[in-house]
Amino acid sequence: MNESKDLKRIQEFVDRLKSTNSTNDKIDIIKEYEEDYIIEKTLKYTYSPFKQFHLTSATVKKNKKLEPREGYNDLFYLLDALTKRTITGHDAIQYVKGYVQYMDEWQQDLVFCILDKNLKTRTGADLINKAIPKCIPTFKVALANSYDKQKGKVNFDTQTWFASHKLDGVRCLAIVDDNGTCNFFSRQ
């Protein structure tokens, strides 16, 4: 990744999306970048519910006493390290500070928007997926239905059904990945 050049291209894309309130225009703009690897990767990292960075720009900015630490010169390597929790806590803050320390203010703002998972373009995963189908993985929690509403439609003799006790306040799914790591996801 050529950081300066790629960040400029991402910022131009963001500025174009910010320049219109029309949903159809936003979809058209996103479609123009469908073959752009960096833009698509930026959208995936920013809007995928399965990519969590465990750090916000506010946390980075408020820890003024922590000195920047250099070690990452590629945005996506840094974000991968945050997602995989290779770097955490004060180390994570220091590496992010080290990554942005020599950047122009607009570049820092862009990196912080990606870190906060919001490019501030008034777009989301649904709109992006209308323009580029399946670009952003979505997470849909199955919602319960009352048995009384389904009573005539259910045939326990010929269909397989699973039931679970509904617990108030517990609205999440546990997903075990290929490495055996269990992650919990909830509706946003």
Question: Each predicted region: which residue ranges?
Answer:
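N-terminal nucleic-acid-engaging modules of covalent nucleotidyltransferase systems
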Residues: M1-Q188
